[in-house]
Regions:
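Long, hydrophobic alpha-helical segments that serve as membrane-spanning/inserting helices
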Residues: 1-8, 29-203
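Hydrophobic membrane-insertion alpha-helices, especially the h-region
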Residues: 11-26
Length: 203
């Protein structure tokens, strides 16, 4: 009778409401995924730009260190203008690495690295910037202080024999060679991440 009709009507209404809720949830999920995908693409493009600039600077640092090592190797017997010669050749200067990590910091602070479903890519990006930080700390704490001490030593001992300078030159050569190797490794990691990010944009 009427009760049965009302019951069927009520059940029908409930089913329609449930369907409506499910559709709304599906649309909401689709919108969230679309927004995440758009944000991820923006992050990816920004990271690619950062990595491209980083690579150029890393190459510049490699050339600088390679040139310095070559000059040190060619230095021969003491000459009167040896100190001035060192300054003219740029041996008393250093070139520190500078990278663009703004995009990475933003992604890290928002936990947005997880937007990349590729765990290997997440780890590679994190390792790259961690390695960069290590090199920067080494340069700031160790090399810069040693170079400053060397410059001070040279300034105060212009009439000194070159024997006292050989240790510093040896350190400079070793430090420059180490930096060269680190920069080379960073470039390799940079190129690997760049390839993965470009593949990500194709998806």
């Amino acid at each position: 009778g009427k009760t049965g009709k009302y019951l069927k009507y009520a059940i029908g209404e409930i089913i329609l409401v449930v369907i409506g809720i499910l559709l709304a949830l599906q649309i909401n999920t689709w919108n969230e995924n679309r927004i995440d995908s758009k944000r991820l693409n923006l992050y990816t493009q920004s990271l690619l730009n950062d990595l491209e600039l980083d690579k150029k600077r890393l190459i510049e640092c490699m050339v600088f260190d390679s040139t310095k090592v070559s000059i040190i190797d060619r230095l021969s017997d003491p000459v009167q203008d040896f100190i001035e010669d060192l300054s003219d050749r740029g041996i008393l200067t250093i070139k520190s690495i500078k990278v663009n990590n703004a995009t990475f910091k933003t992604m890290s602070s928002n936990n947005d690295l997880e937007l990349y479903q590729n765990i290997d890519l997440q780890n590679s990006i994190s390792k790259y910037y961690a390695d960069v930080e290590y090199v920067i700390r080494f340069e700031n704490v160790y090399i810069n202080n040693s170079y400053s001490n060397f410059v001070e030593f040279v300034t105060r001992n212009r009439g000194h024999t070159l024997e006292g300078l050989k240790g510093y030159l040896s350190f400079m050569k070793s430090a420059s060679e180490n930096e060269f190797d680190w920069y080379k490794e960073l470039i390799g990691l940079n190129e690997s991440i760049t390839k993965k990010l470009k593949d990500q944009l194709k998806k």
